[in-house]
Amino acid sequence: MKAIVLASGGLDSTVTAAVAKRDGHDLFFLTVSYGQRHRIEVDRARQVAQALGVVNHVVLDIDLRAIGGSALTANDPVPKDRSVTDRQGEIPSTYVPARNTIFLSLAIAYAETMKASLVYLGANVVDYSGYPDCRPEFLNAFEAMARLGTRSGVQGKGIEIRAPLLSLSKGEIVRLGASLNVPFHLTHSCYDPLASGVACGHCDSCRIRREGFRAAGMTDPIAYAEAEP
């Protein structure tokens, strides 16, 4: 069965792709280059696609900098060195307005074209504590919308939205990825990398990634600008 995977080149989407492959699906990657400051993730998505042997990889250029509203698409500072407590209970400045709504809309369009009935994305419990478009309620509502607003849906075939990491902590995601031989060394998580592409080690995404590998009892294979204290 064909599966569309929203592939950012990050840890979560790569583990998600490995889950879809484990489950016997033919992988079709969709990556969106949206003007993000960490554009290196698009290159990493290409490398991951090659490593996992995807059938096809579409990279769309949609520049969301024209809309703005996020530290990821503007020159606003990316939050650094925030504690777990600091990261809870608020929508961070790295939230990109309606990003998953946009990405999932593109994914179901791709799914219809490829006659695929599955769309995978890497949303998880760490994300939906701060990002409203990673919540289970949102994903369920989007799937219902897709049934009403697509040819596949009105013809009774539908497109299922799957987020297999939704209930997992970052440590559990890392352990799952390790069991599936995920190429962690190819993935990129940092929101504010150096010009060389090396992860800053201080943004929320870097800290969460490091916490995940630490919880899993594993060494993160990527380079950081500074060693973990």
Map each language-model feature to its residues.
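ATP-dependent adenylation/nucleotidyltransferase module used to activate substrates
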Residues: 1-180
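Mid-to-C-terminal catalytic subdomains of enzymes
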Residues: 121-126, 170, 174, 183-202
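Iron-sulfur (Fe-S) cluster-binding segments and ferredoxin-like electron-carrier domains
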Residues: 179, 196-199, 204-229
